[in-house]
């Protein structure tokens, strides 16, 4: 049985950029519902006892998702999203991460521009990701609709932003580009992204 994990900081820790009210609904209602519904769906099935990652890969079913896929992927995506942020985040990455960004996108500024564009142009609900492609040993930007994530493509997720309306509507209403800019400038945890890259390239 999966349990709803709290974000790695207090609910008001990302104020004023992400309000505790947003967390109350986004984590306390939406994320909780994905976990609760997943537990109901897998109870007593062959999926019971598998890791979240395994459930995602099995239920993706090569692009013809089985019923548990959406809740499993959304439970995973949200935990990953909370851990992609930190209080007093933003700034620029350093070390190997910055080297790969410069190599694969031309510059950090070019990467930010592309990431923001990917997040802003994801039509409807979904996610934008920085991912590592292990076969090519390269970074890539990925947009995914609804619950999908780069795991189903065989990529390693490094960073994500949630662009479902419930992620930003209480704080930014329909101003998705403003939310994306604040995420990159004030919230992103480059330490988390760097440690994920280190694990992916180990």
Curated annotation (Swiss-Prot):
Query: From which domain of life does this come?
Result: Eukaryota
Q: What is this protein called?
A: Superoxide dismutase [Fe], chloroplastic
Enzyme Commission numbers on file? 1.15.1.1
The UniProt function text for this chain reads:
Destroys superoxide anion radicals which are normally produced within the cells and which are toxic to biological systems.
Cofactor binding remark: Binds 1 Fe cation per subunit.
GO cellular component term, pick one: chloroplast nucleoid
Look at the named UniProt entry and state the broad enzyme category this protein falls under: oxidoreductase
Q: Where is this protein found? A: Plastid, Chloroplast
Q: Which Pfam families match?
A: Sod_Fe_C, Sod_Fe_N
- Supply the gene name: SODB
- Origin species, per record, is Nicotiana plumbaginifolia
